[in-house]
Design a protein with these regions (language model features):
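Cation-handling catalytic/transport regions enriched in His/Asp/Glu
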Residues: 1-263
Length: 263
């Protein structure tokens, strides 16, 4: 796409770090050497305004054959103070294309938004300040857990952030205002379609977890549900039951609506 040459992984990561630094008075200091499970993993000390270490942030951004698809945040160690001060260790895992030679990784729009989204989850874990680990970081009601991540997405759509960090990977030229305006407009295009997809998926999730009868035919179950809800035939659910991992093995059972609720 036209905007991709301006969205190098390095630039977008720096945009995320700088946004967090300005919002929360923290700093990210790269760790040169540390034990890691793969060479692609990078690590950062997260430091507050008084130079106190508040957590460790790890990134594993590149796709590889042995890695599960998708993107997520994982807490290797939750913050707590119940039995002494325990600092969080948080990782963001993505599947961006790995660089070839000296070429930079160029992200598409979806990848850039994903980086900010998962970084929001990471900040939720890193900035946690609770006594008990059971309440730490993302261990909150599902109604709220997507709020920090959805909020962070807004910053990659912010003109000031884009103009500062979206620079051409070869020339260093800042993104032209006309191109930036086209990108921002594209984020608002066809929102009725996208919203209906999300609503349909949320209904499907709730239907699976409230249906008392045994479901023998998944396709028939879906068609009947969407007909009852008045889903236009031109629009399908964001997910079908057979690939809707969020609600069966992803911790979002009867809670997929929380994405829209957080928005």
């Amino acid at each position: 796409s036209e905007i991709q040459p301006y969205l190098s992984l390095t630039n977008i990561r720096n945009a995320a770090f700088t946004t967090a630094e300005r919002l929360f008075d923290i700093k990210f200091k790269e760790i040169e050497k540390f034990p890691k499970y793969h060479e692609d993993v990078e690590g950062y000390e997260v430091i507050d305004q008084e130079d106190n270490l508040i957590g460790i942030f790890l990134t594993d951004y590149y796709a590889r054959p042995s890695k599960q698809g998708g993107a997520w945040m994982t807490s290797y160690r939750d913050q707590s103070k119940n039995d002494g001060v325990v600092l969080p260790i948080i990782i963001n895992v993505c599947n961006f294309p790995k660089p070839i030679g000296l070429s930079p990784v160029l992200l598409n729009l979806e990848h850039a938004i994903t980086l900010f989204h998962e970084f929001g989850h990471a900040l939720h874990g890193l900035l946690s300040d609770v006594t008990y680990p059971s309440l730490s970081g993302t261990s909150v009601p599902r109604d709220y857990v997507e709020f920090p991540s959805q909020m962070m997405e807004n910053w990659i759509r912010n003109p000031e952030v884009l103009f500062e960090f979206a620079t051409h990977h070869e020339t260093g030229e800042r993104i032209p205002e006309e191109l930036m305006s086209k990108y921002l407009a594209s984020q608002k295009f066809n929102q009725g379609f996208a919203t209906t997809e999300y609503i349909a998926a949320s209904y499907l999730d709730l239907a699976w977890h409230t249906e008392k009868k045994e479901i023998e035919d998944v396709n028939l179950f879906e068609k009947k549900l969407f007909k009852e809800k008045g889903l236009p035939i031109e629009i399908d659910s964001r997910y079908q039951s057979t690939n809707f991992s969020h609600i069966f093995a992803g911790g979002y059972s009867a809670s997929y609506y929380s994405y829209m609720w957080s928005e």
